[in-house]
Amino acid sequence: MREIISIHIGQAGAQVGNACWELYCLEHGINPDGQMPSDKSVGGGDDAFNTFFSETSSGKHVPRAIYLDLEPTVIDEIRTGTYRQLFHPEQLITGKEDAANNYARGHYTVGKEIVDLCLDRVRKLADQCSGLQGFLVFHSVGGGTGSGFGSLLLERLSVDYGKKSKLDFCVYPSPQVSTAVVEPYNSVLSTHGLLEHTDVAFMLDNEAIYDLCKKSLDIDRPSYANLNRLVAQVISSLTTSLRFDGALNVDINEFQTNLVPYPRIHFMLASYAPVISAEKAFHEQLSVAELTNTVFEPSSMMAKCDPRHGKYMACCLMYRGDVVPKDVTAAVAVIKTKRTIQFVDWCPTGFKCGINYQAPSVVPGGDLAKVQRALCMISNTTAIAEVFSRIDHKFDLMYAKRAFVHWYVGEGMEEGEFSEAREDLAALEKDYEEVGAETVGDDEAEEEM
């Protein structure tokens, strides 16, 4: 088996996690109490969904997941909510005091006390796996727990499980919408850790997803639940081929192989189609070609950045539902002829496609329509550097005056870490610039050597 352990950190991680597990349960026909009427092999069994769920001898399906937060309120909602019987109580770990939007609290003071307990629970889950494939980690980089504790845990996972892939879903601060004044500090410090300790990071930002919900689903005031259900569809599409059988399956390691040209350049942009409400879907059904065009639209991106300003290095297209390889080939051929979609000159093909016959499920009473086919695109583009330069700029404005820095130093952090992290991000922006630059002719390159 190729099992995967999901780790949900902080409020953002936990709430995205709730939406994901709600959707996985629906897709596999697992009830909120963990029973699965359709599953004939009770206790164990080698079904495809066992990558995400372990089975007990009584036929209960338990998510291979851990929730961690430094304060209890968000996870208490799971302990009392609809899915309270789904998770093992030991999988929900909470501290008593929160990280107060402070990276240093999450990483040094408060986080230190709880990290060994968390790693112990991770080890227990890992011991139940016959062939652990990797980790999916969910967190935000703007808060204190997600940024500080998130990077602490990733560092420790690198030590204990060096060879396993770590895929990271991180919610980045939006350009306009901010939830904390010190977001830029936390994000820069956290990204510094993500650069080293994750294999692939998927960037999400609330503002981009708000706009998607508003525009495509006609929700006037989207709530986090609306956003998270959309994110859950993306994450579900990424993991479908791990949980169901399909025509072109995509393994977790294949993401890395196909999307990451250089180890540091591993920040991905995600987009998803069709995002349509039930009323609209009644009148239209999107073809493979239309879906393929839609995911390349800047308005479909899950992070605020315009791919037309950069070049693509690689794209992963995951189709699901009623899709045949012939249609996919035709759709990709059309995309390749478009002038607006530019690839770097050293990566001429750049497409990896996956097809899965499992049609997308939707949460009953949710906003998304039930459709026959859907497409999720993960792309590695130089445009994502926009996200970093935005955060860096805000960081510089505050750090020039050393505003709020005493809160971090007071929690045992050294001021040097700020400049170290900031320099690392400056180098990252430069890396993206170089990757997108035109390759010089061989003769010139040799002269420069």
From Swiss-Prot:
This is Tubulin alpha-1B chain. The source of this protein was the multinucleated Plasmodium of the slime mold. At least two alpha tubulin genes are expressed in the plasmodium. The modification N6-acetyllysine is found at K40. GO terms for molecular function: GTP binding; hydrolase activity; metal ion binding; structural constituent of cytoskeleton. The active site is at E254. It is found in: Cytoplasm, Cytoskeleton, Spindle; Nucleus. GTP binds at Q11, E71, S140, G144, T145, T179, N206, N228. Acetylation of alpha chains at Lys-40 stabilizes microtubules and affects affinity and processivity of microtubule motors. This modification has a role in multiple cellular functions, ranging from cell motility, cell cycle progression or cell differentiation to intracellular trafficking and signaling. The gene is ALTBN. Keywords: Acetylation, Cytoplasm, Cytoskeleton, GTP-binding, Hydrolase, Magnesium, Metal-binding, Microtubule, Nucleotide-binding, Nucleus. Belongs to the tubulin family. Signal peptide: none annotated. Gene3D superfamilies: Helix hairpin bin (1.10.287.600), Tubulin/FtsZ, C-terminal domain (3.30.1330.20), Tubulin/FtsZ, GTPase domain (3.40.50.1440). Dimer of alpha and beta chains. A typical microtubule is a hollow water-filled tube with an outer diameter of 25 nm and an inner diameter of 15 nM. Alpha-beta heterodimers associate head-to-tail to form protofilaments running lengthwise along the microtubule wall with the beta-tubulin subunit facing the microtubule plus end conferring a structural polarity. Microtubules usually have 13 protofilaments but different protofilament numbers can be found in some organisms and specialized cells. Its EC number is 3.6.5.-. SUPFAM superfamilies: Tubulin C-terminal domain-like (SSF55307), Tubulin nucleotide-binding domain-like (SSF52490).
